[in-house]
């Protein structure tokens, strides 16, 4: 069992954070199909399914980084992702209007994206400082994909899902 992280060097912090986000991405690969199925907006379900494919690629990139550093491919329980996904699960289990649930799913998904963007931004910076240039490039690629996924979620929210959810409270929609 992995105990506390070692803060005696930036390299150890880098490896610990790699293990953490690796586990987080693996958790996400498991959760995204359920989240996609819970979405009622076809565009939202499609965006989540597309991001599942990207997330599978993120796992592969992280495995490449571990291997390039001569490390065993091993995760460390990502409690942050676990908590975010638990909140998403609660949303999926709630009774209510479909459009409001979709708005809540977007919010939960954006929290995940922002968590990942923070993780990949830090990891990229650490990799650059440590001279792990190939790893930095892979991490930058993943960071850009996470940013694009967040932007897509923004577009969906602002492109009608939030308005549909608002109409429920205004008596404009009965599902």
Residue ranges and their predicted role:
Residues 1-175:
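Amphipathic alpha-helical hairpins
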């Amino acid at each position: 069992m992995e105990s506390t992280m070692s803060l005696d060097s930036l390299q150890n912090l880098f490896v610990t954070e790699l293990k953490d986000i690796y586990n987080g991405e693996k958790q996400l690969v498991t959760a995204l199909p359920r989240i996609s199925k819970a979405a009622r907006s076809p565009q939202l379900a499609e965006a989540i399914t597309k991001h599942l494919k990207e997330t599978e690629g993120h796992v592969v990139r992280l495995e490449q980084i571990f291997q390039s550093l001569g490390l065993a491919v091993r995760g460390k329980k990502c409690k942050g992702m676990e908590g975010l996904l638990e909140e998403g699960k609660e949303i999926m289990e709630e009774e209510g209007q479909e459009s409001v649930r979709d708005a809540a799913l977007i919010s939960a998904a954006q929290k995940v994206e922002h968590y990942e963007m923070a993780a990949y931004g830090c990891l990229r910076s650490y990799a650059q400082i440590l001279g792990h240039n190939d790893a930095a490039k892979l991490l930058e690629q993943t960071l850009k994909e996470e940013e694009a996924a967040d932007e897509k979620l923004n577009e969906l929210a602002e492109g009608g899902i939030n308005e549909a959810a608002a109409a429920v409270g205004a008596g404009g929609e009965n599902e």
